[in-house]
């Protein structure tokens, strides 16, 4: 697994000294324990000596991410890059080490700091169909969370969702449709809009274009670049090849 980094243009407020990292990973490790099944436990009663299998997915990762940067994590399948992305997004807690967001250790955050972290770091998944609730309409997929978290009033949800759909290149008239009524590229745009809906500062892209046709990949990568400029986003982009990163890397 390798990491590439694109830095944002220097800003006036950085002249006085080094800016505090927006996101910092310190000694991150993640292990998954596969417990023995029933047959293995029975065999142990007979003296077999079987043990649970431990998968060491991530081992000792240190990383600092400044606001506005784009970090590319590239590696072969199974190297732990997606697991690292999930740790950053708070989906999987690390086995060892810690994540800091805006200078605050996530292990000791107050409730308000925890909410800012959970809303401020969003994730876009590789398989758009699997990551969208098939029983929910697009207007609710995108608009439910910002209403629940008080970012938008319920009465303004439809307007808010329509604006987000336009930003990602979707017709707002499709807001009442279900995920299965869209193409793969359109479903991924829904996933992008859902992430944007919570007004994040960091977006983790977990092979976000890997499941799309090559022509659609280019369109979605260009969209990421546009959204980065519009919303001052920071990206942590996971991919099995650097070929899906160049468009994002323009600074």
What are these regions, as identified by a protein language model?
Residues 40-47, 105, 156-173:
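Conserved ABC ATPase "signature" region
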Residues 97-105:
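Conserved ABC transporter NBD signature motif
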Residues 197-201, 217:
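A short, proline-enriched helix->beta-strand linker immediately N-terminal to the Walker B motif
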Residues 242-251:
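Single conserved hydrophobic/aromatic residue that forms the stacking wall/gate
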């Amino acid at each position: 697994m390798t990491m590439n980094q694109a830095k944002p243009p220097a800003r006036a407020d950085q002249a006085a000294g080094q800016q505090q990292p927006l996101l910092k990973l310190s000694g991150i490790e993640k292990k998954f324990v596969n417990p023995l099944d029933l047959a293995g436990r029975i065999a142990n009663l007979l003296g077999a000596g079987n043990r649970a299998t431990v998968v060491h997915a991530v081992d000792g990762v240190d990383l600092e991410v400044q606001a506005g940067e784009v970090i590319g994590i590239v590696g072969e399948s199974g190297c732990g890059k997606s697991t690292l992305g999930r740790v950053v997004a708070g989906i999987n807690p690390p086995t060892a080490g810690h994540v800091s967001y805006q200078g605050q250790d996530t292990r000791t955050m107050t409730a308000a700091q925890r909410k800012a972290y959970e809303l401020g770091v969003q994730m876009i998944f590789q398989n758009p169909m699997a990551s969208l609730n098939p029983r929910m309409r697009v207007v609710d997929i995108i608009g439910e969370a910002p209403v629940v978290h008080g970012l938008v009033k319920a009465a303004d949800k439809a307007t808010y969702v329509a604006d987000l759909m336009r930003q990602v290149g979707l017709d707002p008239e499709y807001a009442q449709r279900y995920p299965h009524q869209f193409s793969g590229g359109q479903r991924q745009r829904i996933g992008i809009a859902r992430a944007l809906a919570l007004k994040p500062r960091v977006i983790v892209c977990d092979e976000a274009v890997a499941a799309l046709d090559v022509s659609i990949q280019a369109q979605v990568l260009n969209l990421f670049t546009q959204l980065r400029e519009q919303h001052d986003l920071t990206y942590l982009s996971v991919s099995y090849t650097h070929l899906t990163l160049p468009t994002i890397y323009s600074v």
